[in-house]
């Protein structure tokens, strides 16, 4: 009887894992889709355009499920704390979720989240689909970070439900890219 119960529990557990959404994401070395969205930096609205930001250097575009959820708040805070490192590497950081712009204004300015240090943008269902980050609902993404080179090629992808690890992974990818593409005095003055 105990073996039967153990086998049944194992079967239920495996079925639950099979039913859980798998994190699919765009692979490294593919071109990132254009991303144009309403965004907020420190509570101030603007239009974010990936192709324009890439003219200035690499972009870390990270998708998260929802503003003010525990994991997303931790992740945003950690990105904010690392902004000096991202800036030194010439990178722009922007978070994206299916939240509306009013909520993102609050999240962008909140000192326990973005703290005004980087922008967050509204990811439409089409954006979520294009970046292959759909969560349980088409308006919510899973937690996926993309590091995108100035030519629009994805250098690194990390899909993980854990809020930790995304910042370190992005910084490693940017440091490796920067070693191959050093900042020259002429480039620094542009």
PLM region descriptions:
Residues 14-39, 185-187:
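N-proximal helix/coil linker or "cap" segments that precede and/or mark the start of modular domains
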Residues 50-73, 77-79:
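Short active-site neighborhood of thiol/selenol oxidoreductases, capturing the structured segment around
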Residues 33, 58-60, 142-144:
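Short loop/turn microsegments at loop-to-beta-strand junctions
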Residues 140-190:
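Thiol-/selenol-based redox modules, centered on thioredoxin-like
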Residues 94, 107-142:
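Short, internal strand/loop/helix patches
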Residues 1-12:
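Bacterial N-terminal signal peptides that target proteins for export
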Residues 36-58:
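A short beta-strand-turn-helix
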């Amino acid at each position: 009887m105990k073996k039967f119960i153990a086998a049944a529990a194992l079967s239920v557990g495996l079925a639950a894992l099979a039913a859980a959404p798998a994190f699919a994401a765009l692979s490294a070395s593919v071109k990132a889709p254009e991303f144009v969205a309403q965004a907020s930096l420190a509570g101030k609205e603007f239009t974010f355009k990936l192709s324009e930001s890439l003219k200035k250097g690499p972009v870390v575009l990270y998708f998260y499920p929802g503003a003010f959820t525990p994991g997303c708040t931790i992740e945003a805070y950690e990105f904010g704390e690392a902004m000096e490192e991202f800036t030194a590497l010439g990178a722009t950081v922007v978070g994206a979720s299916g939240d509306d712009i009013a909520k993102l204004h609050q999240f962008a300015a909140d000192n326990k989240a973005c703290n005004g240090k980087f922008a967050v943008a509204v990811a439409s269902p089409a954006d979520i689909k294009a970046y292959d980050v759909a969560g349980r609902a088409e308006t919510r993404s899973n937690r996926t970070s993309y590091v995108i080179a100035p030519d629009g090629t994805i250098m690194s992808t990390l899909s993980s439900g854990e809020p930790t690890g995304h910042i370190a992974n992005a910084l490693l990818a940017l440091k490796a890219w920067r070693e191959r593409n050093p900042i020259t005095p002429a480039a620094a003055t542009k």
